[in-house]
């Protein structure tokens, strides 16, 4: 989102959905892993759309429990009988999967490439098994006896929830407390000491009572496929500020465990890798819908139609969610009206959790909530060796007893650690067979070109020249110039999506002439008069209204109603799109989604000249909205442009009241232009969203329909299709391979399958009453895991991995990104290899820094940073390097700021705030302000780049909150695998250009960001710049990079800087404060 604080709250909620990368699977075959080919991926590259798939390969999934890996099977598999234990399968595929045992059916758009990512490949496809991870040589032991006792279920807040009566609700609680009541939970807890055990315990060495002695699991995080404030089970009340969560210092202590039944403890181990899980079926589930059955029996006695309509049996609608350390990592679809459901569903999911058990929670889905049926737990110690655990297990209730005689769940689970997943060992890879990020809706598109942008505009000569390989020089892009030219040159279509689009914004401001006087609205209106189809898809801010002459600007000040009114009598079609929940969601959930969440994508899609009187599609993707406050240059002026290029474009939501003489808020952002096949995927995203938003409902059915507004480019002869668009040879040093990622769900797009069993054909995740594309999170995890040297991130937010915080583990910020970065660094420390992570964030979230929402965001950010440094320090201690290095030799956080002396003429305006102690007066006196980092980008090893609209927090990564889009790209001729040294392609030039902007210099050590010399040099520059920014004396700042104003000691403890506990001039605790407000307002 783009604004914060009381003026623009940025509410966040819990993460209600897992992180599986779904993929279609055939029924388990007898040969799940064929001999490896010469390279890891050999699926051919198809045109768009690809041809219908042939019969899926027989190896596409692991075998079911009843089928052995030897032999062959030429006919359909029979799943009518109970699965029996089988021999251990070979190592699973190396990517996250989540699939059903159903034959995928053709659909209009079929992504292609790697079969796991884009659907089944042709029969000749083969998959490489990781050579260094041989299959276990022994068969698994018989299923272990069922536990006689089991702990109470941990926190499953906002999804899998259960009241004391057994029923949970999916809607948001209306109580004032931020946390659900579970006070008496501690009353049943038993503290036990857990002696260190073997790091990789053998199944045969497990204690005989391991099933009877489940540990208390108080680093449980919300199982949030179904948002709710209730827990599972509801055992009393815990206040977050005073509970065990708030006081626990160790996020993953192996020395102390809590058990609800006092039956011993289990060892907490780090699961970092992938889990290969099959959920086959359940039997003899209890009927949880007895109330409905009673009503049915009552009405069944009535004569006539009612009797005939109620004769069918009413029973449970079960589903299973899989959680590790309380964070949901997988979820089956709901089987309606079944006490013997058969799912045959597969998950291949990334994990980065300290946990003692894996939980399989069986629930009954209801319209108003969900009821607990029971639980199956698998101790992590049993799977840690890599052995496949498979069998049928009794489903136990919260008392540790069978929920019903004979009720059981058949499943299998196998863990593959990171060091056995070779796909993450070589960066983006080399050669034509690399297929990008698997398990995504859109495939990797080869042979395109990309232009990378920093800020809205870079004037000529403002940044230094950067030499690249092949004697080339990096060319600094001019984003809004290029957008203006692309729109002006369009002949067929101009499609724009935005969180905010303002018709008054001027894209060209550095030249004299008509272009500099032309507003965006005038440009679009003139193009529509030329016959170009101009469509604007803008988020409909629910707080802005224009009804019968009554107008409100809205809390977010997005100008949505103003822009709609401007184009009202033109041929430009403006569709204001609210962020709606599905019809099957509860009323409260619908209100929450519609009020809190947004459409956050920022795209411009136009047709462009393809030569030969043909047209092609190009697209702009990134973080820049076409609205006020966004135009800026790498100088990021505060006062000097207030009477020139920013005269009619003042933006600074930090200040309230009199703005006279205040500094503007400088704006730093990242954007990109895509030319090639991937641009058509951006077009597909727009079409899917437009068709969904244009579908009339309610009173809108009587209004003008927008359904026919989209151009059918396949029916326009002069517009090339994706398979015909010009491509660049992979051998061309300027060739790019590009992939589009999204965070979005089926409530915001048209085209997702209605049947969840068909969802895996498009690599979608199942949620309650919704299908989810969360491939942005998938892409970040893949890129971080594959990083070998350094990671450079610029992002508006940095919150996540709350399941590993030292407090408030249950808020639901469960995205893996911060934990994956910390574990990557820890892995490199243990390997005695250099690695560095540089993370640039805003000084504070946009808005009033003393506001409750802003302070809570800073608090969660502090918890995230603290967790990462503690993880790094632990690795230093384990390797005996804590004396030689500190955590900041590997990980550093920065922000941006600027300061201007008064030049000859003070352009800050006339007058000054009357109160000398207001933030306005103090900022004008000190002549300093932060540069707001609105970027959403990451560079890995100078070979891979991600740029989009998604922030690093739950709201952007979850897929069911804000809608987001991003692109990931690399140049095949500029990778470590090909060069065997640091690549010097366009991505390297882009990163160096950003550093030149932030530090006002280019040092030789910048070419090796992972080196200790570079890390310390950059940190020293940031510390020096912060001192200049915070000093009493006013001076011009050359560089803008500031060390984030917290103190990190050698043990990784993060504290406020002594004497600088609050932000200069504007106030607000730098490390935030815990203020009890609704969680989804801040994560």
UniProtKB/Swiss-Prot annotation:
This is Phospholipase D beta 1. Ca(2+). Requires micromolar level (PIP2-dependent). Residues 26-38, 46-66, 132-148 have a biased composition (Pro residues). GO terms for biological process: defense response to bacterium; lipid catabolic process. Residues 595-630, 929-956 form the PLD phosphodiesterase domain. It is a peripheral membrane protein. Induction: Activated by wounding, methyl jasmonate, heavy metal, osmotic and salt stresses. The gene is PLDBETA1. Its cofactor is Ca(2+). Residues 191-213, 222-231 have a biased composition (Polar residues). Residues 252-393 form the C2 domain. It catalyses: a 1,2-diacyl-sn-glycero-3-phosphocholine + H2O = a 1,2-diacyl-sn-glycero-3-phosphate + choline + H(+). Residues 26-231 are annotated as: Disordered. GO terms for molecular function: metal ion binding; phosphatidylinositol-4,5-bisphosphate binding; phospholipase D activity. Hydrolyzes glycerol-phospholipids at the terminal phosphodiesteric bond to generate phosphatidic acids (PA). Plays an important role in various cellular processes, including phytohormone action, vesicular trafficking, secretion, cytoskeletal arrangement, meiosis, tumor promotion, pathogenesis, membrane deterioration and senescence. Involved in regulating stomatal movement and plant-water status. Can use phosphatidylserine (PS) and phosphatidylethanolamine (PE) as substrates only in the presence of PIP2. Disulfide bonds: none annotated. PANTHER family: PHOSPHOLIPASE D, PHOSPHOLIPASE D BETA 1. InterPro entries: C2_dom, C2_domain_sf, PLipase_D/transphosphatidylase, PLipase_D_C, PLipase_D_fam. It comes from Arabidopsis thaliana. It is found in: Cytoplasm; Membrane.
């Amino acid at each position: 989102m783009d604004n914060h604080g009381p003026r623009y709250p940025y509410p966040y909620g819990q993460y209600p959905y897992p992180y599986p990368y779904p993929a279609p699977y055939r029924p388990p075959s007898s040969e799940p892993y064929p001999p490896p080919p010469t390279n890891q991926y050999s699926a051919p590259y198809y045109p768009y759309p690809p041809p219908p798939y042939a019969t899926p390969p027989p190896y596409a999934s692991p075998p079911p429990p009843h089928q052995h890996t030897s032999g062959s099977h030429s006919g359909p598999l029979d799943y009518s009988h109970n699965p029996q234990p089988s021999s251990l399968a070979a190592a699973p595929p190396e990517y996250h999967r989540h699939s059903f045992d159903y034959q995928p059916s053709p659909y209009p758009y079929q992504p292609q490439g790697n079969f796991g990512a884009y659907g089944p490949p042709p029969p000749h496809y083969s998959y490489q098994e990781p050579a260094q991870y041989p299959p276990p040589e022994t068969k698994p032991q018989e299923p272990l006896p069922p536990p006689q006792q089991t702990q109470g279920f941990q926190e499953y807040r906002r999804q899998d929830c259960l009241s004391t009566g057994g029923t949970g609700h999916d809607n948001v609680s209306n109580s004032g407390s931020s946390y659900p009541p579970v006070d008496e939970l501690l009353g049943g807890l038993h503290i036990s000491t857990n002696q260190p055990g073997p790091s990789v315990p053998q199944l045969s060495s497990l204690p005989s009572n391991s099933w009877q002695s489940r540990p208390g699991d108080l680093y449980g995080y919300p199982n949030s496929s179904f948002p709710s404030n209730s827990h599972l089970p509801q055992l009393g009340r815990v206040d977050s500020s005073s509970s065990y969560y708030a006081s626990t210092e160790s996020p993953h202590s192996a020395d102390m465990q809590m058990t609800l039944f006092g039956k011993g403890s289990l060892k907490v181990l780090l699961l970092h890798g992938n889990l290969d899980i099959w959920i086959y079926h359940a039997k003899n589930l209890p009927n949880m819908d007895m109330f409905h059955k009673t009503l049915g029996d009552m009405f069944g006695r009535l004569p006539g139609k009612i009797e005939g309509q109620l004769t069918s049996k009413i029973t449970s609608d079960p589903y299973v969610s899989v959680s590790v350390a309380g964070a949901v990592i997988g979820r089956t679809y709901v089987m309606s009206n079944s006490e013997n459901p058969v799912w045959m569903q597969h998950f291949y999911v990334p994990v980065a959790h300290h946990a003692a058990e894996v939980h399989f929670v069986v629930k009954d889905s209801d319209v108003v909530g969900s009821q607990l049926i029971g639980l199956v737990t698998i101790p992590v110690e049993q799977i840690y060796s890599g052995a496949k655990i498979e069998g049928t297990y009794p489903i136990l209730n919260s008392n540790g007893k069978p929920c019903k005689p004979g009720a059981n769940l058949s499943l299998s689970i196998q863990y593959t650690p990171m060091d056995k997943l070779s796909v993450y060992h070589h960066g983006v890879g080399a050669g034509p067979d690399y297929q990008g990020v698997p398990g995504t809706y859109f495939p990797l598109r080869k042979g395109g070109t990309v232009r990378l942008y920093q800020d809205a505009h870079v004037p000529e000569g403002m940044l230094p020249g950067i030499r690249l390989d092949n004697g080339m020089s990096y060319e600094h892009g001019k984003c809004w110039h290029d957008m203006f030219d692309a729109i002006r040159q369009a002949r067929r279509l101009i499609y724009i999506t935005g969180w905010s689009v303002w018709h008054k914004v001027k894209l060209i401001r550095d030249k004299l002439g008509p272009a500099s006087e032309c507003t965006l609205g005038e440009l679009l209106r003139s193009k529509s008069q030329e016959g170009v189809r101009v469509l604007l898809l803008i988020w409909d801010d629910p707080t802005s209204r224009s009804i019968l002459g009554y107008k409100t600007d809205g809390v977010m000040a997005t100008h949505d109603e103003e822009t709609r009114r401007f184009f009202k009598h033109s041929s430009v079609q403006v569709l204001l799109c609210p962020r709606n929940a599905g019809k099957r969601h509860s009323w409260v959930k619908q209100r929450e989604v519609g009020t809190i969440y947004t459409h956050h994508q920022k795209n411009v899609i136009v047709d462009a000249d393809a030569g030969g009187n043909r047209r092609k599609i190009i697209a702009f993707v990134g973080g820049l909205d076409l609205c006020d406050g966004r135009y800026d240059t790498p100088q990021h002026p505060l006062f000097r442009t207030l009477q020139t290029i920013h005269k009619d474009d003042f933006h600074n939501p930090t200040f309230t009241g009199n703005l006279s003489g205040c500094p503007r808020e400088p704006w730093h952002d990242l954007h990109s232009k895509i030319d090639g096949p991937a641009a058509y995927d951006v077009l597909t995203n727009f079409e899917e969203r437009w068709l969904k938003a244009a579908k009339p409902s309610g009173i809108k059915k009587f209004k003008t329909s927008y359904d026919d507004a989209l151009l059918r480019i396949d029916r326009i002869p002069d517009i090339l299709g994706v398979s015909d668009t010009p491509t660049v040879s992979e051998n061309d040093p300027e060739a790019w391979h590009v992939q589009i990622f999204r965070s979005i769900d089926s409530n915001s797009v048209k085209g997702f399958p209605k049947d969840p069993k068909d969802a895996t054909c498009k690599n979608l995740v199942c949620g309650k009453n919704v299908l989810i594309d969360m491939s942005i999170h998938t892409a970040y995890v893949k890129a971080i895991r594959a990083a070998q040297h350094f990671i450079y991130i610029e992002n508006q937010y940095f919150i996540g991995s709350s399941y590993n915080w030292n407090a408030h583990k249950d808020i639901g910020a469960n995205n893996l990104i911060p934990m994956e970065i910390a574990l990557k660094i820890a892995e490199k420390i243990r390997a005695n290899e250099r690695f560095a992570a540089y993370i640039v964030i805003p000084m504070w979230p946009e808005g009033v820094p003393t506001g409750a929402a802003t302070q809570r965001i800073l608090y969660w950010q502090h918890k995230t940073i603290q967790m990462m440094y503690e993880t790094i320090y632990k690795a230093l201690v384990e390797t005996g390097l804590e004396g030689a290095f500190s955590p900041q030799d590997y990980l550093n956080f920065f922000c941006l700021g600027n300061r201007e002396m008064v030049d000859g003429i003070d352009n800050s305006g006339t007058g000054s705030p009357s109160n000398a102690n207001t933030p306005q007066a103090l900022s004008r006196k000190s002549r300093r302000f932060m540069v707001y980092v609105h970027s959403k980008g990451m560079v890995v090893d100078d070979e891979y780049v991600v740029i989009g609209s998604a922030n690093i927090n739950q709201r952007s990564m979850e897929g069911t909150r804000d809608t987001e889009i991003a692109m990931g790209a690399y140049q095949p001729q500029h990778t470590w695998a090909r060069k065997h040294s640091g690549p010097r392609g366009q991505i390297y030039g882009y990163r160096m250009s950003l550093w030149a902007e932030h530090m006002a210099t280019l040092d030789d050590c910048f070419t090796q960001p992972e080196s200790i010399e570079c890390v310390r040099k950059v940190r020293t520059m940031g510390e020096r710049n912060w001192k200049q920014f915070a000093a009493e004396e006013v001076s011009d700042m050359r560089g803008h990079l500031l060390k984030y104003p917290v103190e990190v000691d050698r043990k990784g403890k993060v504290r406020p800087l002594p004497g600088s506990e609050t932000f200069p001039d504007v106030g607000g605790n730098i490390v935030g404060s815990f203020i009890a407000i609704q969680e989804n307002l801040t994560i």
